[in-house]
Amino acid sequence: MRFSTLLKDLQTGEAELRWSQCGADPILAGAASLEQAKGDQLSFLEKGNALIAALTETGAGALLLPDQPDLIQCASERGIAFAVLANPRLAFAEALERLHPRLRPLAEIHPSAVVDERAVVGPGTFIAPRVCIGASSRIGANCIVHPGVVIYDDVEVGEGCELHANAVLHPGSRLGRGCVVNSNAVIGSEGFGFVPTPRGWRKMPQTGQVVLEDGVEVGCGSTIDRPSVGETRIGAGSKIDNLVQIGHGVTTGRGCALASQVGIAGGAKLGHGVILAGQVGVANRAVVGDGAIASSKSGIHGEVAPGEVVSGYPAIPNRLWLRCSAAFSKLPEMAKTLRELKRDISQ
């Protein structure tokens, strides 16, 4: 694809193409990082990116750049075709879709798949080998169900969903339109509910369901548990990384982002647009307000106000945590000073 042709496609996207200099108008066969790109590949750079130095050595045939004069000058002097955009990263994502279009499998049900006669599979849907679909389940139109997926009874999957190899959807699970469940993720597994008795732990039946609203994506090996009653609900457009555990009865708002190894205990509530970085833990029934952000390994107990950024365990406002961290490194010196003061006083 010619760079100029790609830019015409990007003009209709959301990345706000401002102007371009196509030069020799290279033919692009793909895309790569700035350090690894070759003459037939596209790359990009964001404003203030630490890789700016790599621009002087990149072998990329074309670049997507922010409106930053030094970057534009460098690309011009090196004779690299480029385009200036308000959001180069978004433009790069759109470009990848055009440079590497996905091949959609034919709509068919493989002979080795086991589909209950009471299940319904919508038109245009592909069911791969060794898929199991239980009674009264409904798979919407234009879905892709990869090998080894297990869909229990009474599951609903909306239009345009993709279920990757060995994903499992337990009874009563509900997926909206355009959801993606990656390999080995488990939706609707039993919540961790037990009642202590003199004879040991009594199991609490988990009769609820999990609901993924439209556009939710769940990473590999992540689990979302169903509650004893009611539902666990993930808000529309939320993105869940690999190896995330979401407990029974949790609710999240729209557009949340949960990084790898996040753990959310039962009954916790997340508002819209919440971001939890890697290994964040959220305690039982904690409440996180709209737009709040928790940095890696934060432990959230109680309530986080809307828009607040928290860090540490237990989680505290990020600015306070930074001050505490700075003081922590000085503790040995402070302890030494304190011992000297005590010795001087005792004399």
Swiss-Prot record:
Pathway: Bacterial outer membrane biogenesis; LPS lipid A biosynthesis. Its EC number is 2.3.1.191. It catalyses: a UDP-3-O-[(3R)-3-hydroxyacyl]-alpha-D-glucosamine + a (3R)-hydroxyacyl-[ACP] = a UDP-2-N,3-O-bis[(3R)-3-hydroxyacyl]-alpha-D-glucosamine + holo-[ACP] + H(+). Gene3D superfamilies: Hexapeptide repeat proteins (2.160.10.10), MurE/MurF, N-terminal domain (3.40.1390.10). One of its GO terms (cellular component) is carboxysome. It is an enzyme of class 2 (transferase). One of its GO terms (biological process) is lipid A biosynthetic process. Keywords: Acyltransferase, Lipid A biosynthesis, Lipid biosynthesis, Lipid metabolism, Repeat, Transferase. Coiled coil: none annotated. It comes from the Bacteria. HAMAP family: LpxD. Homotrimer. PANTHER family: UDP-3-O-ACYLGLUCOSAMINE N-ACYLTRANSFERASE, UDP-3-O-ACYLGLUCOSAMINE N-ACYLTRANSFERASE 1, MITOCHONDRIAL-RELATED. Catalyzes the N-acylation of UDP-3-O-acylglucosamine using 3-hydroxyacyl-ACP as the acyl donor. Is involved in the biosynthesis of lipid A, a phosphorylated glycolipid that anchors the lipopolysaccharide to the outer membrane of the cell. Belongs to the transferase hexapeptide repeat family. LpxD subfamily. This is UDP-3-O-acylglucosamine N-acyltransferase.
